[in-house]
Amino acid sequence: MERAITPEKRDDDLQFDATLRPRTLQDYIGQEKIRENLKLFIDAAKGRSEALDHVLLYGPPGLGKTTLANIIACEMGVNIKSTSGPVIERPGDLAAILTNLEPHDVLFIDEIHRLSHVVEEILYPAMEDFQLDIIIGQGPSARSIKLDLPRFTLVGATTRAGLLSSPLRDRFGVISRLEFYTHDELAFIVTRSARILGMAIDREGALELARRSRGTPRIANRLLRRVRDYAQVRADGAITLSVVQETLRLLEIDEMGFDQMDRMILLTIIDKFGGGPVGLDTIGAAIGEESDTIEDVYEPFLIQNGFLNRTPRGRVATPAAYQHFGRLTPERPQGSLF
């Protein structure tokens, strides 16, 4: 069964997200500094009748990068073309997209860190000079021609900004990191989503759902769907604190927003490896999960909330992790082997 609290996109999220997605910066909740800056830059670009500078959005999955890309296009009054790094396999794929853009259009590339180097090299002159270099012919007779492109805005999104090459990163005029959301912000998002779906939810229920959503709107909205199911079948249709608590108990999501996999990671470090330090590959082998998945999907929330430390020697469970599971914190310094 798929995790209810994975921040990664799932197929069943697509239609639901489209229904709930805000269309304007005014409707967008959270990320105050990013919203303020984007409004300034968009207003300035529209005032000059120019395309917005290229924008790079990075941060953990599920925080609203795709939503912001769509809002940018909406606020600019232009079309958006969406694709992703893995889909653009050849330079010709990118060339076909670029040549079909209209002036000031937004090109959104999700997982932009997964573009191949060959495709990236096509993107450099397109971003900087709005030109496309095309090679005609082969061998000594090959020649390069330049095609002019309309001035467009590239919005790139990534969960791993460190994997972007410097030449690509340096071509973005606006670079913004999305942060995890506060409980109050998520409660507002849940309340707004419930209203759009025609559901009644009280303040306590919204806050409880927010507290268990790992600071991530995508998770909050997904859990809201499950709570809605419970309220419809086993309650009177209204979402209250007790309805939220009982739904999440059935889903095995505890008061910190941990599910079985989170608990497995922390308990593996505590019980099998003495609290750490232990390498990521070793943890992955012990629980049967890819180390990249642990690093990208599970770790950010555990580290952000003080349950896991990342050290040069490996991962270490913190005293908060021991307390959460009712374990005594070791008196010896973490990581001492002898």
UniProtKB/Swiss-Prot annotation:
Q: What is this protein called?
A: Holliday junction branch migration complex subunit RuvB
Q: Which GO terms describe its biological process?
A: DNA recombination; DNA repair
Subunit record text: Homohexamer. Forms an RuvA(8)-RuvB(12)-Holliday junction (HJ) complex. HJ DNA is sandwiched between 2 RuvA tetramers; dsDNA enters through RuvA and exits via RuvB. An RuvB hexamer assembles on each DNA strand where it exits the tetramer. Each RuvB hexamer is contacted by two RuvA subunits (via domain III) on 2 adjacent RuvB subunits; this complex drives branch migration. In the full resolvosome a probable DNA-RuvA(4)-RuvB(12)-RuvC(2) complex forms which resolves the HJ.
- Entry's Gene3D superfamilies? 1.10.8.60, P-loop containing nucleotide triphosphate hydrolases, Winged helix-like DNA-binding domain superfamily/Winged helix DNA-binding domain
Asked whether the keyword Metal-binding is assigned, the reply is no
Q: What class of enzyme is it?
A: hydrolase
Q: Which residues bind Mg(2+)?
A: 66
Give the gene name.
ruvB
